[in-house]
Design a protein with these regions (language model features):
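Short, acidic, Ser/Thr-enriched surface-loop or helix-capping motifs
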Residues: 37-39, 164-165
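Thiol-/selenol-based redox modules, centered on thioredoxin-like
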Residues: 150-195
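N-terminal targeting signals for export/organelle localization
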Residues: 1-36, 192-195
Length: 195
């Protein structure tokens, strides 16, 4: 009985698999946290998500990262290109948001430089941070993003593509290698409003 409970009736075998299944079955609302970034004054994340009525694909990163964050940036560059090449109807748009979990270092100016380096189009892809450390921790905890300082000024962290709806709820989690699936799901959700 314990194995059945731990694996959601033998549907998943990892903690990440369990997270994905749990989110798909029960969307997770973002906590009350504020974000800021280049062109984004301090504002509630939930309000920003709801403001444009669009579906948002989110990743978590930090600008000093020289490993997985660069891969995530490359994935978002490809997703941005696809969004530019295949625009959707107004009101059914998808956008991208990179959130730094290193808010004390990643100031809006540093995020702006990083965005320029990646060729981010601010109409489609924005960068932000959660300026309050306690709020950042609450957001990471709620969305089950694991970030561990490595003792050398860097971080070990999991990486995924998180799809959030216009109500500010995490509705799906995709592996970084599933970028096409994540974007197609986000577009479907934007067009139909159904998870």
């Amino acid at each position: 009985a314990g194995a059945s409970w731990l694996t959601h009736d033998f549907q998943v075998w990892t903690a990440e698999g369990a997270r994905r299944l749990e989110v798909a079955l029960q969307p997770v609302p973002v906590p009350e946290v504020s974000i800021e970034g280049p062109g984004l004054p301090v504002q509630p994340l939930a309000g920003w998500l709801a403001g444009a009525g669009r579906v948002t694909v989110v990743d978590f990163m930090y600008t000093r990262c020289e490993t997985i964050c660069l891969s995530l940036g490359g994935v978002f560059q490809q997703m941005q290109r696809r969004l530019q090449q295949e625009p959707m109807a107004p009101g059914a748009a998808v956008r991208l948001l990179s959130i730094s979990f290193d808010g004390s270092y990643d100031t809006p100016a540093r995020l702006a430089a990083y965005a320029r380096q990646l060729g981010a189009d601010p109409a489609l892809w924005q960068f932000s941070r959660v300026p309050q450390a306690s709020e950042s921790a609450a957001l990471l905890r709620r969305l089950q993003v694991v970030v561990v300082p490595d003792g050398r000024g860097d971080y070990e962290h999991n990486a995924a593509l998180l799809v959030l709806d216009a109500q500010g709820r995490l509705v799906r989690v995709f592996d970084v290698s599933e970028q096409e699936l994540a974007l197609n799901y986000a577009r479907h959700l934007a067009a139909t409003g159904r998870t």
